[in-house]
Amino acid sequence: MNAEKSPVNHNVDHEEIAKFEAVASRWWDLEGEFKPLHRINPLRLGYIAERAGGLFGKKVLDVGCGGGILAESMAREGATVTGLDMGFEPLQVAKLHALESGIQVDYVQETVEEHAAKHAGQYDVVTCMEMLEHVPDPQSVVRACAQLVKPGGDVFFSTLNRNGKSWLMAVVGAEYILRMVPKGTHDVKKFIKPAELLGWVDQTSLKERHITGLHYNPITNTFKLGPGVDVNYMLHTQNK
């Protein structure tokens, strides 16, 4: 279980990094700022495992892993997991939590572009969850993810659609009314329409396999996957 440091690449928004550095110590607080991530993680994990045909014995890269919620859960499924993030504090939290949990995950402080330059074609599965909307050049991340996966391997993206409903739900609702996440977590201008993401995917060796929405019901306080990608959505692609 390593936590390596790396030079900063151009595709980093230091203000975004600072946001997550400031709350890193509470990453594994099930009732804290990251409660929504803990709540949706079983849905994400189930979707990834099902679409990828299981994770046991596979080499997996989690891009933008933060404090390691998804990375740890994939390791528990029997995957060999590497977690990438540019936030030093979140990686320290992830490393300590994995140690306490007896879970083996390699954590590296490095951009996905830097990692792709050294590890092209080495992963069976690459995940990039809620990360694209936090970098200056999300298309560059998509290209790097495509370079990192083996032929026939699976790449998963999740992000937020850019429209009025998404702004109301993810910013006004989640940040200011329900206070599910800290204020300022999201910038609607950085949200990504599915057509934009699919356009970037089409310029790589990846091919779209499936897309699904992630929906929150404030009345029942529950999340579920289903049709409709107008707010949160996940995309499964495969290397041709």
Swiss-Prot record:
Pfam family, one: Methyltransf_23
An annotated GO BP: ubiquinone biosynthetic process
Major location category of this protein: cytoplasm
PANTHER family in the record: METHYLTRANSFERASE, UBIQUINONE BIOSYNTHESIS O-METHYLTRANSFERASE, MITOCHONDRIAL
UniProt name for this protein: Ubiquinone biosynthesis O-methyltransferase
Biological pathway: Cofactor biosynthesis; ubiquinone biosynthesis
EC number: 2.1.1.222, 2.1.1.64
Keywords, sorted A to Z: Cytoplasm, Methyltransferase, S-adenosyl-L-methionine, Transferase, Ubiquinone biosynthesis
GO molecular function: 2-methoxy-6-polyprenyl-1,4-benzoquinol methyltransferase activity; 2-polyprenyl-6-hydroxyphenol methylase activity; 3-demethylubiquinol 3-O-methyltransferase activity; methyltransferase activity; phosphatidylglycerol binding; polyprenyldihydroxybenzoate methyltransferase activity
Subcellular location per the Swiss-Prot or TrEMBL entry: Cytoplasm
InterPro entries (UniProt xref): SAM-dependent_MTases_sf, UbiG_MeTrfase
Annotated function: O-methyltransferase that catalyzes the 2 O-methylation steps in the ubiquinone biosynthetic pathway.
Subunit structure, interactors included: Homodimer. Component of the Ubi complex metabolon, which regroups five ubiquinone biosynthesis proteins (UbiE, UbiF, UbiG, UbiH and UbiI) and two accessory factors (UbiK and the lipid-binding protein UbiJ).
Catalytic activity: a 3-demethylubiquinol + S-adenosyl-L-methionine = a ubiquinol + S-adenosyl-L-homocysteine + H(+); a 3-(all-trans-polyprenyl)benzene-1,2-diol + S-adenosyl-L-methionine = a 2-methoxy-6-(all-trans-polyprenyl)phenol + S-adenosyl-L-homocysteine + H(+)
Recorded GO CC terms: cytoplasmic side of plasma membrane; cytosol; ubiquinone biosynthesis complex
